[in-house]
Amino acid sequence: MALTLTDVKRIAHLARLELADADAEHTLVQLNDFFGLVEQMQAVDTSGIAPLAHPIEQIEDVALRLRNDVVTETVEREAFQRPAPAVQDGLYLVPKVIE
């Protein structure tokens, strides 16, 4: 799939972007290079290859990198609220700023 300069200008118009002719030509080259790369990737036969959730698992055991979900800290609400000027029922009281 190759774009034309008209395509780039139309996309810029739809996106409400003002694009100078030199910028449009530069963008055209970049987009066509990108689409060329996508076509190369699509040409590779990947049938029979399982998708990878974590590509690093091909190198090392992913389970070692993921830890168990355990509580490591305790809630110290009272200690945090001790220096506060006003607290009620575990909530910080602040002055009203909007009438």
From Swiss-Prot:
Q: Does the keyword ATP-binding apply?
A: yes
Looking at its record, which EC class is this enzyme? ligase
InterPro entries found in the cross-reference section = Asp/Glu-ADT_sf_sub_c, GatC
- Give yes or no: UniProt keyword Ligase: yes
User: What are the entry keywords?
Assistant: ATP-binding, Ligase, Nucleotide-binding, Protein biosynthesis
Catalyses which reaction?
A: L-glutamyl-tRNA(Gln) + L-glutamine + ATP + H2O = L-glutaminyl-tRNA(Gln) + L-glutamate + ADP + phosphate + H(+); L-aspartyl-tRNA(Asn) + L-glutamine + ATP + H2O = L-asparaginyl-tRNA(Asn) + L-glutamate + ADP + phosphate + 2 H(+)
Q: What is its EC number?
A: 6.3.5.-
| Molecular function GO terms recorded | asparaginyl-tRNA synthase (glutamine-hydrolyzing) activity; ATP binding; glutaminyl-tRNA synthase (glutamine-hydrolyzing) activity
Q: Name one GO biological process term.
A: regulation of translational fidelity
Role, per record: Allows the formation of correctly charged Asn-tRNA(Asn) or Gln-tRNA(Gln) through the transamidation of misacylated Asp-tRNA(Asn) or Glu-tRNA(Gln) in organisms which lack either or both of asparaginyl-tRNA or glutaminyl-tRNA synthetases. The reaction takes place in the presence of glutamine and ATP through an activated phospho-Asp-tRNA(Asn) or phospho-Glu-tRNA(Gln).
**Listed HAMAP family:** GatC (MF_00122)
Report the sequence similarity comment from the record: Belongs to the GatC family.
Q: What is this protein called?
A: Aspartyl/glutamyl-tRNA(Asn/Gln) amidotransferase subunit C
Task: Tell me what gene encodes this.
Answer: gatC
